[in-house]
UniProtKB/Swiss-Prot annotation:
Protein name: RNA helicase Mov10l1
Compositionally biased residues, Polar residues: 345-372, 674-688
Protein's organism: Homo sapiens
Keyword Cytoplasm in record: yes
Assigned keywords, A-Z: ATP-binding, Cytoplasm, Developmental protein, Disease variant, Helicase, Hydrolase, Nucleotide-binding
SUPFAM superfamilies in the record: P-loop containing nucleoside triphosphate hydrolases
Its biological purpose: ATP-dependent RNA helicase required during spermatogenesis to repress transposable elements and prevent their mobilization, which is essential for germline integrity. Acts via the piRNA metabolic process, which mediates the repression of transposable elements during meiosis by forming complexes composed of piRNAs and Piwi proteins and governs the methylation and subsequent repression of transposons. Involved in the primary piRNA metabolic process.
Cited CDD domains: DEXXQc_Mov10L1, SF1_C_Upf1
Record-linked InterPro entries: DNA2/NAM7-like_C (IPR041679), DNA2/NAM7_AAA_11 (IPR041677), MOV-10-like_beta-barrel (IPR049080), P-loop_NTPase (IPR027417), SF1_C_Upf1 (IPR047187)
Compositional bias (Basic and acidic residues): 694-710
Domain of life per record: Eukaryota
Stretches for region Disordered: 340-385, 674-710, 1192-1211
Length: 1211
């Protein structure tokens, strides 16, 4: 039974032999008109700044040099040479220096491809027929893949590769999985469409799964499998092959064989049925009729038992009537569907009077049954006399007179479509004859009137980039130096520039393989390549940012005056396109005249919506007479330079911090006794209603305020006391009786605070793993306060990736009411405007203007980037005893290192708080992402053995080593029905519902819920995605209109009215955000927040509406036309964990089912009976019975709630 799996395992490490002769026959591609290119090896005999000679025969320019090794006279090189047809001279178009390493490894001193193969560890990023790419750039053919392994996008592989000298690209010669294992007797826990999951942790897809002949996987089957490491949405393993161990006892009713294919649609029994059954485009509120003819071309009469609808369309937009053969065929017409019961007769279908009379008669006939059924509800005889399991006998109706179609006779059905649900829709019409069944798809595309308000204003066209020739045209440019920008701080500026290497820039711009510049990228991250690898990734991100900014450059712009300053209007600035900040540099150029242009350097001093105030050379400001100017945006490299600087200065932290393996226990920092009576009182089951509310508010909003008296603070003894008593008081603050400032923390939160305070494993980073709504920030606040008061020698640096997160920490510490004045300071970036800082935080910001003074405060709060300011004033290593990084999962590793470099590697303590399952750092360069810049320091540590989940060793401690990780599991935000799916997909079913029941159950009675007591709606919309103008962003008018309607229903609901400020709309595309805001503005609901997933991280709303936008069902195979960044499990997790009481998801199930996370959400919604809208794909049709009461015992169905219940206090 396991022969297939055994064969795959046996050959996993056997590489297919590839003749070396084939590799040597690869010729460089020739441009049109070239004679021939050849590769030569020689020595540089002359080298100047912009050109050189090889063997005094071959000329090359500096642009042709692609090696990262600096060229010198006498340097051995390999060059691709072409011959000039006119002069017969030789010119090198690419020159690569031969490094010493290559010379040592090379046997015959040939080209780089002749050197020993190098090893690449990477992820398969693309696959086409017969080939693929690893980490975006390294090509491999399937012939180089080890036998038995069929790679899939997302698989982690180990490959041997060489550099092809003709094209300077890397090509893998051997590919095998990085890690694999065999798992026995595991259960198929989920199967949605063609995707499934084993034991809720191993992904598989039927598109690439190897199976024994005759076996089709089914939910509940017990199987053995061989799995490989692979990044598949929220899963890290992929099943390669699978064999059955034990089949489920019996298939449930809804898993019966589908009969939807060509057999069902095929004409049978000499009966021919109209083939074209598409209603085309129909306006909402209108109706359209269609005649479907049924003709008997045989010699025997055929009995039509019944005609039914399969019930795919939940909106019931289709209805039909069958007329006798002697009746006149009705005229196809368009009519309005009455919106009210007392509508006039003009809104009724205008069939002839005979037809109208017959309608009332036939509506009661057994031949017309407009009741939704599932395809397993009727049984008819097939052509061979066998039973077809399609319609159940209990729903069959006896044939009435007129159901017989004689030989040569005809009858017809009038099908009416009422436009109700915007978007495309498909229904299945079943014509059940006595001996066979014929089906036809009924399709329509319904459009609403509101869609015209947001229709595309102009056709989409790609923005044309300026040609390289235009960018490098000869000019004489005079640079007028502007006065230095005003700075609130006069800091020594010794931060090195870390310029981007020219050869790296050429690799990106000319699309040369990045491994030719930095082969270390192919290696796993380690201490020896740490700095070089991250420096290259930072430069790649900078290059992309610069290229992106160039797309926003403007020409012929006229500036406006505002007093002595000039104002530039930048369209799209309010949406972050481009992203500008105060202090950024812009270049203004006069229009070119006779090849001359004057260039002025300006600085941004103020930003208001799309108006940017500039500070330029005073002479220019006075002389400017509204002449048109060209504007170039520049990338602010300050944060990047600080990251480079940190990479150089964190080396002292060493392997024990950056690559921790062993745990060496140290003596605890605090040895005091905790007030267990306080613990018991705050966490007991009998906590009062007031305390329960306080706990919920504290976990959700962190607004708990508690004024601590003198007895709670470690105050030094009065100076009047004896000296010995004073010394004893100083030496024993660690032994004092400990109490929590926030008494309503739950047990996990208290344990985390105690472990942070103890610091047993310092300097190893301690991780506070905080899933959504579990009170992570509240725990950090308590830990900071405890360290501050228990350790009088401490100096705490609290950082976060964003200003908003840093402000929140500062606000919560301020609201604690326990800190003395001049204890805490908030350090802002120089360019941050004071107006956008909340009032409660402003006093702490004023103390932060003087960096020297700020560095002496006991608690310093800033962003990760701004913590680099302390390097500039010469703060020594060890200045900070504790470094807390909140939302550490959102910071790139180099960014997180900026504050860590200021901490001692011996006695310092690092605390990283965040969730590796939520959004990581924002990285735009695909190359930088492919090589790991998008993985945060927090996430990388969590993947190391010391921090990994181990249920066997630490099952009693939350499955993680309690000395290094504490996972918070009590969720104070969401309803149970909304929490179950993310808990299962991302958090091992460990999240516990602890939210305030009066909040999370407040919308259970909303009249629009498909299932009362279940606050989730998945509304299927088969809309059309579109783009307009030169914007590459997508929008979906049908979904935008549906979002508008839900917002109106909620805001104006009689039974459950929701404030506009309590509703949030999440959509991944800027253009959809823009369109939804237009619609909401028309109905005066502008208080509803509409934004991307990134804008909602860390926030919560009573109601969340998600518009997924993408709806193209025809181009699944092309990432550019499929889900794009929508298929990101971390974005999915953030989106569905924002609501407290209601989640509404709008999307096309035919597209979303291909993503594992959205597929799981669809399965969850259908099984619990909360799916509505368009028809489902055939792969999901079988699940509809689960929502109608036929539940699959292997899949969790959440019981519906009826309202607020008694809330049990967390222990």
């Amino acid at each position: 039974m396991l022969s297939l799996a055994a064969k795959l395992v046996a050959f996993f490490w056997r590489t297919a032999d590839t003749p070396r002769e084939e590799a040597g026959q690869l010729e460089p591609e020739l441009a049109e008109g070239d004679t021939k290119l050849k590769t030569v090896r020689g020595v540089v005999t002359r080298y100047c700044s912009d050109y050189g000679m090889i063997d005094d025969m071959i000329y090359f320019s500096s642009d042709a040099v692609t090696s990262r090794v600096l060229l010198n006279v006498g340097q051995e090189v390999i060059a691709v040479v072409e011959e000039n047809k006119v002069s017969n001279g030789l010119k090198a178009i690419r020159v690569e220096a031969v490094s010493d390493k290559w010379e040592d490894d090379s046997r015959n001193h040939g080209s780089p491809s002749d050197c020993g193969p190098r090893v690449l560890i990477g992820c398969v990023t693309s696959l086409v027929e017969g080939a693929g790419c690893i980490s975006q750039t390294t090509y491999f053919s399937l012939e180089s893949v080890c036998e038995g392994f069929e790679p899939c996008k997302g698989d982690w592989v180990e490959a041997e590769y060489r550099i092809r000298p003709g094209t300077w690209s890397s090509e893998a010669t051997s590919v095998k999985p990085l890690r694999y294992k065999r798992v026995d007797k595991v259960c198929i826990s989920s199967l949605c469409g063609r995707n499934g999951v084993l034991e809720e942790s191993i992904f598989f897809t039927l598109d690439s799964l190897k199976l024994p002949d005759g076996y089709t996987p089914r939910r509940g089957d017990v199987v053995n499998a061989v799995v490989v490491e692979s990044s598949q949405s929220c899963y890290v393993w992929r099943a390669l092959c699978m064999t059955l161990v034990k089949r489920r006892d019996a298939a449930p009713v809804h898993e019966a064989t589908h009969f939807y294919g060509t057999i069902l649609l095929k004409n049978k029994g000499d009966i021919e049925v109209t083939q074209v059954t598409h209603f085309g485009t129909l306006k909402e509120g209108r109706s359209k009729t269609m005649v479907i003819w049924i003709e008997n071309k045989g010699d025997i009469p055929q009995n039509l038992v019944s005609c039914k609808l399969a019930g795919w369309d939940k909106s019931k937009q289709f209805r039909f009537q069958m007329l006798d053969k002697d009746q006149m065929c009705p005229v196809v017409s368009f009519v309005s569907v009455p919106e009210k019961e007392n509508s006039s007769d003009e809104n009724i279908n205008s069939l002839n009077s005979h037809t109208k009379n017959k309608t009332s008669q036939m509506s009661e006939s057994s031949l017309v049954n407009n009741r939704g059924i599932s395809p397993g509800d009727c049984t008819c005889k097939g052509e061979n006399g066998e039973k077809d399991n399609i319609l159940s006998r209990k729903q069959m109706t006896e044939p009435e007179p007129g159901g017989l179609v004689p030989p040569g006779g005809k009858t017809f059905i009038v099908v009416i479509c009422d436009g109700k649900n915007p978007g495309r829709c498909k229904e299945l019409l079943l014509l059940c004859f006595s001996d066979f069944l014929i089906g036809r798809y009924l399709e329509v595309n319904v459009i609403s009137g509101e869609e015209s308000l947001i229709a595309a204003r102009e056709p989409f066209s790609w923005k044309k980039l300026k040609s390289s020739q235009a960018l490098t045209s000869a000019k004489t440019t005079v640079v007028v130096t502007a006065q230095k920008r005003n700075s609130r701080r006069q800091l020594p500026s010794f931060l090195p520039q870390y310029p981007i290497p020219d050869r790296l820039r050429k690799c990106v711009e000319q699309k040369i393989d990045i491994l030719t510049f930095q082969p270390l990228l192919a290696e796993l991250l380690n201490m020896s390549n740490y700095k070089e690898k991250f420096s290259t990734l930072l430069w790649l991100e900078e290059i992309y940012a610069e290229m992106e900014l160039k797309e926003y450059n403007m020409s012929g712009i006229i500036l406006r005056r505002n007093g002595d300053l000039l104002v530039l209007e930048v369209p799209g600035l309010a949406e972050g396109r481009p992203s500008l900040y105060a202090g950024d540099k812009l270049i203004l150029k006069t229009q070119e005249y006779n090849g001359h242009a004057i260039e002025y350097i300006s600085y941004v001093t103020e930003i208001h919506e799309e108006d940017v105030t500039l500070k330029i050379n005073p002479e220019f400001e006075q002389a400017y007479n509204f002449e048109p100017m060209d504007v170039e945006f520049t990338y602010n490299r300050t944060t990047s330079r600080r990251c480079h600087f940190a990479l150089e200065h964190v080396i002292h932290l060493g392997v024990k911090v950056l690559f921790p393996e062993e745990i060496i226990l140290q003596s605890p920092q605090v040895t005091g006794n905790w007030n267990h009576a306080q613990d018991t009182k705050s966490s007991g089951q009998s906590t009062s209603k007031k305390n329960r509310k306080t706990m919920t508010d504290q976990a959700e909003h962190g607004t708990e305020e508690r004024r601590v008296g003198d007895k709670d603070l470690p105050v030094l003894a009065p100076f009047t006391a004896e000296m010995s008593d004073w010394v004893d008081e100083i030496q024993t603050p660690k032994a004092r009786k400990m109490e929590f400032f926030n008494p309503v923390l739950n047990e996990n939160q208290k344990l985390a605070v105690k472990r942070i305070l103890s610091g047993d494993c310092r300097p190893l980073p301690y991780i506070l793993f905080g899933p959504p709504g579990t009170g992570k920030t509240v725990t950090i606040i308590e830990a900071v306060l405890q360290v501050h008061f228990a350790l009088p020698d401490s100096r705490i640096l609290v950082c976060a990736p964003s200003n908003s997160a840093a402000d929140l920490v500062c606000l919560r510490l301020h609201e604690s009411k326990v800190l003395q004045p001049a204890t805490m300071v908030r350090v802002n970036a120089t360019c941050r405007f004071e107006e956008i800082v909340i009032d409660a935080v402003k006093p702490y910001c004023r103390d932060g203007e003087d960096i020297w003074k700020a560095s002496r405060f006991r608690i310093i709060i800033t962003t990760c980037s701004s913590s680099g300011l302390f390097y500039q004033i010469g703060v020594r290593v060890g200045h900070f005893t504790h470094v807390f990084v909140d939302e550490a999962g959102q910071a790139s590793e180099p960014e997180c290192l900026i504050p860590l470099g200021l901490m001692s590697d011996i006695s310092g303590q690092i605390v990283l708080a965040g969730d590796p399952m939520q959004l990581g750092p924002v990285i735009k360069s695909r190359l930088a992402m492919a090589y790991g810049l998008n993985v945060s320091f927090l996430e990388r540590l969590m993947s190391r053995p010391a921090y990994q989940r181990d249920e066997n060793a630490f099952g009693a401690c939350g499955a993680h080593n309690p000395l290094l990780v504490t996972k918070l599991v009590k969720n104070y935000r969401s309803h149970e029905a909304l929490l179950m799916l993310p808990s299962r997909l991302f958090y091992h079913r460990e999240l516990e519902v602890c939210a305030d029941p009066t909040v999370v159950t407040s919308l259970l009675g909303w009249e629009k819920l498909p299932k009362k007591g279940f606050p989730l709606i998945f509304h299927g919309v088969r809309g059309s995605e579109a783009r307009e103008g030169k914007s590459p962003s997508w929008f979906n008018p049908a979904e935008a209109v549906q979002v508008l309607r839900y917002c109106c229903l909620l805001a104006h609901s009689i039974s459950s009215q929701v404030s506009a400020s309590d509703i949030g709309v999440i959509t991944p595309y800027r253009k959809q955000v823009e369109k939804i805001r237009i619609l909401l503005r028309n109905v005066d609901l502008m208080d509803i927040k509409v934004g991307s997933v990134e804008e909602f991280q860390g926030q919560e709303y009573l109601v969340i509406i998600i518009s997924t936008v993408r709806s193209n069902e025809d181009r699944f195979e092309d990432d550019r036309y499929f889900l794009g960044f929508l298929s990101n499990s971390k974005r999915f997790n953030v989106a569905i964990t924002r609501p407290k009481a209601l989640l509404i998801v709008l999307g096309n199930p035919h597209v979303l089912v291909r993503d594992p996370c959205f597929g799981a959400l669809l399965e969850y919604s259908i099984t619990n009976g909360v799916y509505m809208g368009c028809d489902l794909p055939p792969a999901l049709q079988s699940l509809q019975n689960c929502g109608e009461g036929v539940a699959d015992p292997s899949y969790p169905v959440v019981p519906e709630s009826t309202g607020p219940e008694k809330h049990q206090e967390p222990s």
